[in-house]
A protein has these predicted regions:
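TPR/TPR-like (Sel1-like) alpha-helical repeat modules
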Residues: 79, 86, 90, 98-118, ...
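Solenoid-like repeat scaffolds
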Residues: 73-74, 157-159, 199-201, 230-238, ...
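Alpha-helical segment of the N-proximal tetratricopeptide repeat
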Residues: 41-70, 127, 131-142, 405, ...
Length: 527
């Protein structure tokens, strides 16, 4: 792939290519895909501006900001660079937005762009559209600001119907403002329709492939994202995020080996970018996939590597807590889960809950339900804090984990009906929403845990139904396959037992020593 960032410039201005600049500096050009963003900046600013747009589309925010500021340095009248700076300072639109300091810097850029006065109405409209995100910044949460940004860019795209970049950014913000409880995925589907047309027109555009993956990052429509997932890493192979993003779709459809491979490449690229946050995020997806294949040795190595990393961002704080937690619970090592150390301090309390949840469930399932009470109380306190902060999404996610942990305490105490009621409530609540984009999946799906509890209660048919329902949202999970196989055996359903044991053996690597795989092979050999 080459970086061919061809721009159709307003006022007939033509800038030098990135390849030329790279050759002059003696460095290889970055392979970031092909984009086209008409602008009226001076020729000497074109290359930096186009590089900034390319990095922006692959969420290379540090590099993008540097490039846009360089465009300003080369042409102090390049007002559209203000739009670029304000846009990259939002950061990942699927996360939590900039700090107040970042917002202040963005507002300064917007004010500069307004003062300069862009040479075209279109450029002035871009600056005003991004300003919609920062209006009344301190008074609104990120979600409300993203909705305003989406509305502004939807109007911009409608007004400039022939502007591909306006259509592409409008689609991104449509998906970013998709409600996690809207199971019709209306905004994401609308975005996908825009992007599919762009994909046919601009197949090497990094943002098109990238945002298609986000638009299809939901269980019911994930397979539609496979073409973009298989293309994106090749479009922008020098961007760590572009190498990671295909695993969002691979995880949704259970392509575990593909997820491991693309995240391994992403980790190498992220280290080269000195981006520990991206390293941790890719590691979380990688360890999740390793554990579905029962590659426990590989997963353990990732756990150890993750312990040496830290980053203040949400995705990395989440990953830093999730990785060792997943390693314990995916292997049903409940005593190990009960002994998990707390994650590093984070400004995001909902990243702490994974460890609390795993410790509580681990203690309850390893014979020490009293030892789980403190962690459940802490989960309840975090729910109160999040509700007070009007962080409804994460308050609900934490409440699911509180209910699940409380269910296993009740179950260990012999209160089976109470336990099953709590566990069903957790599963229903979780199913009503979607996982966050910061995560490959919840620590353990609540409906999968309901299957565990039903199976241990001697209700094999109900357990089988729970596991199969869990597999709809979280396909090809090894624990769900094993649970479904055991439930089928207990229910006397030999055909389904054989099917699920076969799926386990076919999916997991042959050299795994997990006892559940040994049992699967023994069952298949005996029948």
């Amino acid at each position: 792939m080459r970086i061919a960032l061809v721009f159709y410039l307003l006022l007939g201005l033509l800038g030098a290519t990135s390849v030329a600049r790279a050759n002059e500096d003696g460095a290889a050009p970055k392979k970031l895909g092909e984009v086209a963003f008409a602008n009226s900046c001076a020729p000497e600013a074109q290359e930096s501006f186009e590089l900034g747009v390319a990095w922006l589309h692959s969420f290379g925010f540090v590099e993008g900001e540097q490039a846009f500021r360089d465009a300003f340095n080369r042409d102090p009248n390049c007002a559209i660079a203000a739009w670029g700076i304000a846009t990259v300072l939002i950061g990942n639109t699927f996360s939590i937005g900039p700090s107040p300091e970042g917002a202040q810097q963005a507002q300064q850029a917007i004010d500069r762009g307004r003062t300069l006065g862009a040479k075209s109405q279109r450029e002035r409209d871009y600056i005003e559209a991004i300003a919609a995100y920062y209006d009344h910044f301190a008074e609104r949460p990120h979600g409300a600001r993203i909705r305003s940004l989406s509305d502004a860019f939807e109007a911009l795209a409608k007004h400039y119907g022939d502007d591909d970049e306006a259509q592409i950014f409008s689609a991104l913000y449509l998906t970013a403002s998709q409600s996690p409880t809207d199971k019709s995925y209306s905004r994401a589907r609308k975005a996908a329709a825009i992007l599919e047309a762009q994909f046919a027109k601009n197949p090497n555009h990094p943002g098109v492939a990238h945002y298609l993956i986000h638009s299809y990052d939901y269980p019911a429509i994930a397979r539609n994202g496979l073409p973009a997932a298989f293309c994106y890493a090749g479009i922008a192979p020098d961007a760590a995020h572009a190498l990671h993003m295909p695993s969002h779709i691979f995880t949704r459809v259970g392509l575990w080996r593909e997820s491991i491979e693309t995240n391994a490449r992403s980790i190498v690229a992220a280290r080269a970018e000195n981006n520990s946050g991206s390293v941790l995020h890719a590691m979380d997806y990688m360890v999740y996939a390793d554990l579905q294949l029962a590659r426990d040795t590989d997963a353990a190595a990732v756990v150890q590597q993750s312990l040496d990393l830290s980053d203040p961002g949400l995705a990395s704080a989440y990953a830093r807590a999730a990785i060792p937690t997943r390693y314990a619970v995916e292997r049903d090592q409940w005593s190990e889960a009960a002994a998990l150390a707390g994650p590093p301090a984070s400004k995001f309390p909902y990243t702490e809950v994974m460890t609390l949840f795993a410790r509580a469930v681990g203690a309850a399932r390893s014979g020490n339900p009293a030892g789980a009470e403190k962690d459940v109380a802490r989960l309840a306190a975090i729910v109160v804090v999040l509700k007070g902060a009007k962080n409804d999404y994460w308050a609900t996610e934490v409440e699911v984990q509180r209910l699940g942990a409380a269910a296993w305490i009740a179950f260990a105490g012999g209160n089976r009906e109470e336990a099953l009621g709590l566990m069903r409530s957790a599963a229903d609540m979780e199913d009503a929403s979607e996982k966050s984009a910061v995560s490959p999946g919840r620590v353990l799906p609540a409906r999968e845990l309901l299957g565990d509890m039903l199976l241990e209660s001697g209700r094999a048919d109900d357990a089988l139904a729970a596991y199969e329902a869990s597999l709809v949202n979280d396909p090809k999970r090894l624990r769900s396959f094993y649970g479904a196989a055991r439930a089928a055996v207990a229910a006397g359903n030999r055909d389904k037992a054989r099917d699920y044991f076969s799926l386990m053996v076919e999916m997991a690597d042959g050299n795994s020593t997990r006892p559940e795989l040994t049992k699967a092979r023994q069952y298949l050999a005996a029948k």
